[in-house]
Amino acid sequence: CLRMVAMHYGKNYSLQSLRSRSFITRSGVSMLGISNAAEDIGFRTLGYRLSWEQLRDEVPLPCIAHWNQRHFVVIYGIKKQRRIPCIFNRTPPEGLKSNRSRNYLIYVADPASGLLKYTEKEFLRCWYSNQKEGIKEGAVLLLEPTQEFFLL
């Protein structure tokens, strides 16, 4: 994941170099390990638990997300889907569901599966990991390149 984010900003690090910096083990790597490696190559990092609305509206992309509570992916795009015109005047007839609340596409780079596109519902099912005061949250690592990143 970190390699993908570094490439986004124009730097190419070997996988081996980043693995050694992140202290990867047989059981994988932690968000702290990724954060330490990122700071080692010149990123400023912040780990957060966020609601979907915070991720969608406030987070600069790309960022790294904890995925299915077992590995990490890069979120590189969140786009509102074009709305299909509704043929009903106000609300759909009883029995038909409106999908107006789920109208985003989330673009994810998964080191295991490649470039993927998820509907909001699919994405949230994989990303949510916690509920705080009735609000569902997921974990992300925000990365911002510093001047040091570009000088290394």
Regions found by a protein language model. Give the residues of each.
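Cysteine-nucleophile protease catalytic domains, especially the papain-like/related folds used
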Residues: 1-47, 54, 69
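Noncatalytic regulatory segments and standalone regulatory/sensor domains
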Residues: 22-29, 57-68, 72-82, 89, ...
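Conserved beta-strand termini and adjacent loop/short-helix elements that scaffold enzyme active sites
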Residues: 48-50, 111
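Intrinsically disordered, low-complexity segments enriched in polar/charged residues with Gly/Pro
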Residues: 51-52, 62
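Alpha-helical and His/Cys-centered functional microenvironments
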Residues: 85, 96
